Amino acid sequence: YMDANGINKTIYLVAFAYYSYRQPPVKLVNGEYVAVDESVIPKKDGKVRVGVMYTPIEACYTHPISDEVETCDKNAQIAEEMKAWASITDYLMMYSYGTNFQAYKYHFNNWSHIGDSIRFYEKCGLKYYFEQACAQNDISPMSSMRAYVRSKLAWNSAYNTQDLIDEFIEHYYGDGAESVKQYFGAVMENFERIYTIDGTEDHNIYYSKITNNESWTRSLVKELQSYLEKADYKIDIGSSNRKDVYKERVFREYFLLKDCEYMKYSGYLNQEEYDELERLVMYGREKYNAYLSTEKTNNG
């Protein structure tokens, strides 16, 4: 049909390897993965070819997906499945996740491992990487930094993730950068405390306990707010001619903390304080279309 109609392009049909379709149709022969038979090998030539979009929704997003560094048993199995798929397809793709669907307005900590994971994907010959984030609100914590770090690693997996984080903050927040670094560092330290409290580091994309009050105490929320208030102040007294831009970027993070305070700890406030907080939160929710705390599905 394509030849008859002068269509000169290559079309890729993509198989979605998701849930029960995640397992690759392979067997081990002398320690190597091979297809169980020729019929399961995705078509690699011609104008219509077949790729595989591997989608490990069950993964732990605290640890790397890799066979080269220490990881959890769940992700070690996922790494083996990726290698198995890579053995039978030339067009391996990845559908990953960058948010907790039960906690849209909370930090999602897959920062420490993302470099190791992307280096492993590169070793597997990955052709395409997609990461689903919080699309139902217009913002989520450090979402711009998340996009920056991942795009840089996609171009060059040898980059150090912490160096990219520092580079982003220094350029994105201007005179407020050092205080934002303190804020982000305190968030990461809190995750270590959360892992100790929960007795596990296995946090998936539906880990609802991350939102409880024990994970984000009132004193911690106020401490995090203070770092961003300091960042805003330093921008005000700085010499940049882009103060409004930097202040807006800080406010996005600040609003999310205020939203957390409003939902969890507004009972500590007197009426005047409560009214002021509510005005800020309602303004932020409208400005950023940030009304949802959890995923809204077609079923409600």
Where are these regions (language model features)?
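Weak global preference for isoleucine
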Residues: I7, I11, I41, I57, ...
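Structured mid-domain segments that build the active-site/substrate or prosthetic-cofactor binding neighborhood
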Residues: E70-E178, Q182
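Catalytic domains of carbohydrate-active enzymes that cleave complex glycans
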Residues: G125, K152-G300
